[in-house]
Amino acid sequence: MIEREERVGLIVYLYYNRDAKKLANFGDIIYHSKKHRYLHLYVNQEDAQNLQENLPKERYVKQVRISHIKELDQNFVGSLYREQENVII
């Protein structure tokens, strides 16, 4: 049976939108905002730390951040009445 690899999202800010194609070699591009010049890149869990250190050294990358999508609560039933304790800004 195929084992599922853990994946993590990286938010990569670019200087120019034309350089987004160069990042396709590092992982899967899920979303590209042309207005705000960033993209959401999915990579393997074991490669994420290495890429977070090495991608800002590229000339076309402005900043790299880890996505916090896995930390969000995805149980939406009754979420309007729940306390505001796990809010990520």
UniProtKB/Swiss-Prot annotation:
GO terms for cellular component: cytoplasm. Keywords: Cytoplasm. Its main location: cytoplasm. Coiled coil: none annotated. It comes from the Bacteria. The keyword Cytoplasm applies. It is found in: Cytoplasm. It holds the Pfam family DUF2129. InterPro entries: DUF2129 (IPR016979). Belongs to the UPF0298 family. This is UPF0298 protein SSA_1730. The lineage of its organism: Bacteria, Bacillati, Bacillota, Bacilli, Lactobacillales.
